Amino acid sequence: MKRLILTVLAAGAVGTAAAQECGEPMTLQRCLELGLEQNYDVRIIRNEQRISDNDATAANAGMLPSVGLTAGYSGALDNERTTPREGDAVTENGIYDQTFDAGVAVNWTLFDGFRIRTNYKRLQELQQMGALRTRITIEDFVATLTAEYYNYVQQTLRLSNFRYAVQLSRERLRITEERFKIGSFSRLDLLQARVDFNADSSKYMSQHELVTASRIRINELLANDDLNGRLSICDSLIEVNSTLEWDRLEAETRAANASLLLAGHDNTLAELDLKSIRSRFYPYLNLTAGYGYTYNRFGNGATQSRGTLGLNAGVKLGFTIFDGNRRREQRNARITIENTELTRQQLEQSLMANLSNFWQAYRNNLEVIQLETENLIAARENYEIAMERYLLGDLPGIEMREAQKSLLDAEERILTAQYNTKLCEISLQQISGNIGVYLQ
């Protein structure tokens, strides 16, 4: 327990130093909030959702009339030669006739076999699917950033453990050098202690790369301009939620998983496509109306000009007798409906399989944590006894190294088990649609 406290304090000291250099430490919740505001994938999918929202209108479905405004001018320049049955021919040159017109026209499809209504429902389905795709992207981002956040905690703790290993090896090297000077230890003992110290130092230096890589990855997910910027977080331990329940996870997965809900909307779209095809078996009814003004100016004749202002309207009823494709398209649409339902069932089975696998790994890792906690206590006590014997000269350097290695391995195993359990926990929460718990 004393060693564990030292590890935590060391990690806390690292976090405090970083905080002094790069500002206030951030919690996981704060990281997620920043990421949801700045991450490029999230911003892109939200813009795509806005497009779906804009498209889901009655006008886009064709439920509203179309109104057009027209205006025009035309002119004709003619030369005329008129020869009567009796008398002389009359020639007129440069006759210029002009026409001005302006009007408003309305076209409205009153009925087309329910196709317009089906199109509107389809646009609404696409709008809901856009919202689900946004949710899926956000859930993927929350899961990815949460996993990387705790990976950074893991790598930082591992760096602290390696630092502690270097301190132990340095102390052992110091003792060995002193004993070698007075003849208590051989040169072989001294060389072995130096080799072990260098090996631990090399591991410590290599671990810095993993910490840096994790920090860069978090900055990338947060869309920070400075990917190499310093990062300070509040957590110095990996806290695992051990209270998850299988029955609740299973029920919530079937009811709230975003991908499963999206597959259900795919099936609904296929059914709407079939309805749209069936609408072609019905007649259609179109309404047209117009209001316009026409002005004619004549270059010759008894009439100099004429203006016409009027309203016109009409109704057109039609029916497509044969187009050669309707029955074939209906058969294909029914097959598509069946396939979308099969795809949804396949996805549900795949999700339940993944949920079961992560659940088994989650429960197993919880037991591993408990077991490795006991091993850590035993390894720590074993190391303390070995150090006492080593200081008395009653324990060879190789056995001392073994005791040190056993302690470090125990710390590594429990850290790995905690992180693996956290990953399983994150996956279970995401599959069941509860990944938002990390935002609370």
Kindly give the residue locations of the regions a language model identified.
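Sec/SRP-type N-terminal targeting helices
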Residues: R43-N47, N60-A61, Y96, L110-I138, ...
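Acidic, low-complexity, intrinsically disordered peripheral segments
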Residues: L6-T7, Q20-E21, R413-Q440
